[in-house]
């Protein structure tokens, strides 16, 4: 583990405070939807969680097929801005994100182990591009993705504790 990178992205102000992961880069890149982890979701295989998420914005089969072929998460995100967005997207996008992110960690044991290794750290999807819904920008935001990751981690920790009883 690169201690310099850890000190840049995992901060603590005092011994009593929980550590904080403030960026999904370096050793914490695996938390990002841009991380190259194949995921099976809704009967399809996706190269990244980003591609799966962007594809779920639409009910157009051709647009979903196009996104399924995309390996580069930045391209998937860009293409996701061009699809015909389903009417109920705002109501379902959080549940979709949760399902996709859970599938990523359920299906990739080494990633689940890495998530568990964050222990009780606060996970923030810190960004500079202004996403205050899924993350935190300039100290502001709902951090929905970070919250999903912490809830998943807590669920996995609960499973581990049950297995060890």
Task: Put a short name on every predicted segment.
Residues 2-165:
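Charged, low-complexity intrinsically disordered segments
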């Amino acid at each position: 583990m690169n201690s310099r990178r850890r000190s840049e992205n995992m901060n603590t102000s005092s011994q009593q405070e929980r550590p904080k992961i403030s960026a999904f880069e370096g050793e914490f890149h695996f938390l990002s939807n841009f991380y190259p982890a194949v995921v099976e979701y809704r009967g399809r295989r996706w190269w990244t969680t980003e591609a799966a998420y962007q594809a779920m914005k639409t009910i157009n089969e051709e647009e979903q097929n196009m996104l399924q072929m995309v390996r580069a998460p930045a391209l998937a995100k860009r293409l996701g801005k061009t699809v015909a967005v389903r009417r109920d997207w705002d109501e379902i996008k959080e549940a979709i994100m949760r399902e996709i992110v859970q599938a990523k960690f359920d299906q990739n044991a080494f990633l689940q182990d890495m998530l568990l290794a964050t222990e009780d750290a606060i996970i923030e999807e810190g960004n500079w591009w202004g996403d205050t819904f899924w993350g935190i920008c300039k100290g502001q935001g709902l951090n929905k993705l970070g919250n999903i990751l912490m809830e998943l981690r807590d669920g996995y920790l609960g499973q581990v504790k049950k297995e060890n009883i």
